[in-house]
Amino acid sequence: VRGRVTVKPEGLSRFVTALDNEGLHRWGPLAPCSRVSVEMDNPQLNWVGHAYMDSNEGDEPVENGFKDWDWARCEMANGDTCVVYDVRPQRGPHRVVAQRFSPNGDHEPFTPGQRFALPASGWRIPRGMCNEINEAPQIISTLEDTPFYARSLLRTTLMGEPVTAIHESLDIPRLVSLPVRLMLPWRM
């Protein structure tokens, strides 16, 4: 595989928030509204589209802070990016962080609608996502399915707009289990 991937931020964001109830784990999108171009020489493929860059950091191991989480992001019709972080902390109540980001760096919270259980992945990873209409979001395809993590494309409605979202589910007890830790050096 040979080629070039170029990510061009349309603007930078200074938004950072706690994901857990004690403020020990933080998330912030660095460039939530970006463009990406992929130019491959071998194989000869080209692609351009919406991109997103973020950062997570913590003052303790992830397994100390969380049981699992679902995360999703989508590009809105006007070029904004909506992100939903739906986390189940080890301590305290369930948390949902939902923010809409503009290319100029502005952001605003929003209410993402009711959470629906989605079909488990092939590795039986539980998945869930919100939708503003009274039906479960539709999984278009599962892009990655491992013993602890699933990434999918799905259709849902956020802020009154039907969207296609990148969705991720992480099962942290599985991530830190001995069999998975032994497999991590190899592609799963």
Regions from the language model: what does each represent?
Residues V1-M188:
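Structured soluble/peripheral alpha/beta segments that form catalytic or ligand/cofactor-binding pockets
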